[in-house]
Amino acid sequence: MEKALCLSWRMGALPGHVEVSREGKAALTVTTGEASVSCSIFFAGKEKPLVLEAAAKAEEKIALRFLPARLELWVGDALADEEWPFGECLYRGETPHPAVTVAEEERAEAPAPAVTGTFTHAAGWRPGGGVYVGDCMPFVHDGRYHVLYLKDRRRHHSKWGLGAHQWAHISTGDGVTWQQHPMAVEITDPMEGSICTGSWARIGGTQYLYYTVRRSDGSAAPIRRSVSRDGYHFTKDEAFAFTLSDRYDGPSARDPKVFPGPEGELHMILTTTRKDSGRGCLAHLVSRDGERWREEAEPMYTSPSAEQPECPDYVAFAGRYYLFYSIRGVAHYLYSDGPFGPWQVPREPTVPCARVPKAAVWRDRLVFAGFLPEEDFLRYAGTMTFKAASAAPDGQLVFEDWEM
């Protein structure tokens, strides 16, 4: 049961601007235009408010909901915008105008079905409603190609720039028709600034999602996980959390990739920085059971500069091993005859798939998924994009468009 404080009114019932103040400072403002509504919620110690906005027609019902870890703006029966709070909210439930109803709600959410919707052709797709596709994390299970992706609003500017990303989930059996599944990992605690990129792993009969959580207070990012039996409904494992040792920069640790080793052990690589040299790297950890992890003496890869190799990926493919990472959104790869190197640099080391793509082996090819910004390439999030690759006899990848 989830409790919410709900403010509701009809478009046209309020003057253009109403405000609730506390100790001489704005706590809540609601601004309405002919076809729009904007709500600003203020917090102690924050210079800027969280702002939720939506288009709305005359007489439509507007609802602003305050939940412990989320703010929602509804227009009619549609969720139009979201934000994610942290800290002391200055608004305490006062009525901003006689036309506004303020009430407490209790919402019992039934488990979502495994398939919540369908669509065709994921290339160029995004969910709509102000939601964009961020980093993609593909995997293959039971013959289906799955993509977990960061659900993005405001191009990484939600929650005062922390991102407030959550994991959404789609899959396909033929590359044409796609199913939408329940949210895989959501923000459920105000201390969670963003659920960062990670990876899927199957250990025994259980499926896991490994990820780091960017902390709202800037402290070291813990490595966390969620657990599922059916692969569609995941639950956070609240007992599982650890951080890297002080050899590495803890707050920047992110993007764990978990994969099986040649002797049945599990390996994890993740983005961070070596404190001794200041160079970006992929820290390397090993586990026998997925529960207890130990750091290897050396990273899997160390960058020649301070730039961090982001969104790492590791794939065994066509008799060789491939290590991927992204620099400024552009993916690079290395390959080796052995599982952990020595790594060779291909003649053309970049992956021609925007941005920060990761891959899974499906139908004898590597199929990459990434995101393509709709305007400025350097702006975060956009629509989903794909690329496929096969391996040449010498191990270098040959890329092609992915079309079904």
Which residue ranges define each predicted feature?
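Carbohydrate-active catalytic/glycan-binding domains of CAZyme proteins
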Residues: E2-C6, R10-A13, H17, S38, ...
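Glycan-recognition/cleft segments
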Residues: H17-I41
